[in-house]
Amino acid sequence: MDNYADLSDTELTTLLRRYNIPHGPVVGSTRRLYEKKIFEYETQRRRLSPPSSSAASSYSFSDLNSTRGDADMYDLPKKEDALLYQSKGYNDDYYEESYFTTRTYGEPESAGPSRAVRQSVTSFPDADAFHHQVHDDDLLSSSEEECKDRERPMYGRDSAYQSITHYRPVSASRSSLDLSYYPTSSSTSFMSSSSSSSSWLTRRAIRPENRAPGAGLGQDRQVPLWGQLLLFLVFVIVLFFIYHFMQAEEGNPF
């Protein structure tokens, strides 16, 4: 606790931000409380950290001036620090979250391939080694994705023609080229060009029963054309006789 008394208000605020401890302005009345929180945090962190990295995980006050400018550049996982500070009693069932997985202290690790992935943030000697490990894992994941993309088959325009000719083969093009019903990959491009040209030649009308307009005009009517002309002449003659008799009656009143 006496080590924190030599720190200035700015240095104490930097420690609070580094450990992700909620705090307000550092004044005379709240300074003692913040020093106690930092002391409890570092004590519990040294107790929970592995023995091999207990010295490296503790914060060295001699390097405070050198790391003051880099305090805002990188931070330890905030979830880890928040859970560490908010855990009541600081019991062994404490969850520490890194960028990759969640680890429970006080419980045995499950055997399997996930053991290599589960790593504590405090196992690294410093933050540079941690970020170097994160960078290596990112490069490994990106290289694996590139390998998966290379293994995926590439489908071009010929594959689309192959599916069309497979489900809708043209009979004329098949018989003329003497090809099998199921096309192969080597003859796909040749069949696509030949089928596209010959399919227009062998296409039939959608409604072949429909004829051109006026082709069967006389057959569709009930009365033939000569019968209609005959009826028209008879009607004209009848009108002519009616008109003639009407004129004769007007000329001879008796």
UniProtKB/Swiss-Prot annotation:
Q: Where are the transmembrane segments?
A: 223-243
Bilayer topology annotation: Single-pass membrane protein
- GO terms of molecular function: actin binding; beta-tubulin binding; cadherin binding
Entry keyword annotation includes Aminoacyl-tRNA synthetase: no
Question: What PROSITE patterns would the database entry show?
Answer: LEM (PS50954)
SMART domains hit by this protein:
LEM
Q: GO CC: one term?
A: nuclear outer membrane
Q: Note whether Plastid occurs among the keywords.
A: no
Q: Which residues carry this modification: N-acetylmethionine?
A: 1
Residues with Phosphoserine modification: 8, 29, 49, 54, 60, 87, 98, 141-143, 171, 173, 175
PTM Phosphotyrosine: at which residues?
A: 161
Q: Which UniProt keywords apply?
A: Acetylation, Actin-binding, Cardiomyopathy, Disease variant, Emery-Dreifuss muscular dystrophy, Membrane, Microtubule, Nucleus, Phosphoprotein, Transmembrane, Transmembrane helix
Q: In which tissues is it expressed?
A: Skeletal muscle, heart, colon, testis, ovary and pancreas.
Signal peptide feature range: none
Q: What does the record say about PTM?
A: Found in four different phosphorylated forms, three of which appear to be associated with the cell cycle.
Domain of life from the UniProt record: Eukaryota
Query: Which disease is this protein implicated in?
Result: Emery-Dreifuss muscular dystrophy 1, X-linked: A form of Emery-Dreifuss muscular dystrophy, a degenerative myopathy characterized by weakness and atrophy of muscle without involvement of the nervous system, early contractures of the elbows, Achilles tendons and spine, and cardiomyopathy associated with cardiac conduction defects.
How does this chain assemble?
A: Interacts with lamins A and C, BANF1, GMCL, BCLAF1 and YTHDC1/YT521. Interacts with TMEM43; the interaction retains emerin in the nuclear inner membrane. Interacts with SUN1 and SUN2. Interacts with ACTB, SPTAN1, F-actin, CTNNB1 and beta-tubulin. Interacts with TMEM201. Interacts with NEMP1.
Give the protein's biological function: Stabilizes and promotes the formation of a nuclear actin cortical network. Stimulates actin polymerization in vitro by binding and stabilizing the pointed end of growing filaments. Inhibits beta-catenin activity by preventing its accumulation in the nucleus. Acts by influencing the nuclear accumulation of beta-catenin through a CRM1-dependent export pathway. Links centrosomes to the nuclear envelope via a microtubule association. Required for proper localization of non-farnesylated prelamin-A/C. Together with NEMP1, contributes to nuclear envelope stiffness in germ cells.
In Swiss-Prot or TrEMBL terms, this protein is called: Emerin
